[in-house]
Amino acid sequence: MIIDFHTHMFPDKIAGRTLDYLSGIFGASPFADGTYTGLCNSMGKGAVDISIALPAVTKVSQVASINRFASAYTEGPVISFGGIHPECENYKEILKEIKNLGLKGIKLHPDYQDMYFDNIRYERIIDAASELGLITVVHAGVDPKCPEDVHCTPKMARKVLDDVKPEKLVLAHMGGNEMWDDVERYLVGQNVYFDTGVILNTMPQEQFLRIVHMHGAD
């Protein structure tokens, strides 16, 4: 079975303009049209059995609608995680609702949420999510939106690991996009997962293999 653990999709009515915005930031064309149907078609072409869809909540006001959309995809070929913003004061209630909706985890994106990952607000969310058995996925390392101001560095992630000791934390992009020397320094061997999203064309192959060998693979 092939699982693509890092994908994105949006409601049909906003998918087009959302992709236009993101394509401008990334300077690249998307593989699909940003919809559920487009993602499924792309999965078929790549022989992918299951995709995990990861939403990015950029405003507190988006939380309810994003999680409502995500709740329609708790099983089948596309499994969506929920989302939360670090400025949500009622984060415990939101996380319980995410759990009750049948969602298996949450996605955090410090760059788009304009907060550094070692902020106590993130630590509280991750701790509460861990207590509920939810997986937490975090964008880690350089993002084209603000490449000179990284909001989740491997060093920040290590602090969160030491402070919170979460059971199911996933750092996207092999622990820190374009910061893989620091991934080796601070994160390899720790109780944390890495995904391989958007790194295979930029990460040195020998370093990728070394990290996989040293950290382990599931």
What does each of the following model-derived ranges do?
Residues 49-51, 135-136, 168-169, 192-194, ...:
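Hydrophobic beta-strand segments of well-ordered beta-sheets in folded domains
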Residues 58-61, 86-89, 101-184:
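Divalent metal-binding pocket/active-site signature
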Residues 7-9, 142, 176, 198:
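Short, glycine/acidic-enriched loop or turn micro-motifs at the edges of active sites
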Residues 75-77, 163-167, 188-191, 215-216:
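Short helix-capping segments at alpha-helix termini
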Residues 68-72, 158-159, 184, 209-210:
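Active-site phosphate/pyrophosphate- and oxyanion-stabilizing loops and adjacent acidic/basic residues
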Residues 174-218:
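H/E-rich (His + Asp/Glu) clusters that bind or coordinate divalent metals
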Residues 1-124, 128, 186, 193-195, ...:
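Mid-domain alpha/beta scaffold segments of enzyme catalytic cores
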